[in-house]
Amino acid sequence: MKYKIEKNTVQETLILPLYSRKLCTELYPNLYRDETAVRLIDEIDYDFSEAEKNSRSLMQRFGALEVAMRQNDLAFEVQAYLKTHPCAAVVNLGCGLDNTGRACDNGRCKIYNLDFPDVIALRQQLLPAGEREQNIPRDLKDPAWFDKIDASGGAVFFASGVFYYFLTEQVRALVQGMADAFPGGVLVFDAANRTAVKMIAKTWLRTAKIKDVGAYFAVSDAPKEIGEWDSRLRVSSRGYMLGYNDLKDPSVSGFFRFLARVGDNGMKMQIVKIGFGDRQ
């Protein structure tokens, strides 16, 4: 029996990124594989006709490539941390229906998926927690979730497409709180400069009737701007389209590689990595 998703619901907002990850898998099979997304889309009763029609457009295909690179980059950083901290907590912040934690599983780490209660309720049905895995129904901005994480073996946190919807002060408070709670841990996430965030925000800000786009989190020079928040933070960043992969694959056109350079350099689309405290 298929799981029915209605239009204009919270569940629908989770289905579209899932569809995008399925599209990535089909368009760029040498660069990205998300078998969970392919399987889940097949198990869901939802009218994908509009998404399928849009998937033929040039910008939708480039958007799918962006999603693929972002997920690959974050997974790379999680796996790099697990090489030196094999029993670490792997924490997906704002997880939706993303299964990156399980994809990075080394057989010893502890996996946590954190999101709002209504999101986790859907996740429990479609992606029930497996061995060494917990789904945590919490608001990311509420530090009460810190106590749910067993960081005795270290902790690596990642957030995909999440902080664009946070005020700068909210990101700063979260990062400083995590530095207190998880010394030796690492947080990785995607970010972009003010110009890019304004473009990302166009639609949802209009519907939310929010005027001050400038208050939302954006960053150009992450080591300088975020490093100033707290002396305990070790901050680095890499372009998220070309910082981890040269995209010299037959599935990626020269025009898309040009757009990738514009994204990394002009829009400062980047993966930011923050190390907390002294313990490594």
Language-model segment annotations:
Residues M1-V91, C95-R138, A151-S152:
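Rossmann-like AdoMet
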Residues R232-F258:
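Conserved catalytic loop of SAM-dependent methyltransferase domains
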Residues K198-V213:
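Short, glycine-/aromatic-enriched active-site segment of Class I SAM-dependent methyltransferases
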Residues V213-Y240:
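Short alpha-helix
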Residues F157-F158:
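A conserved beta-strand element that flanks and buttresses the S-adenosyl-L-methionine
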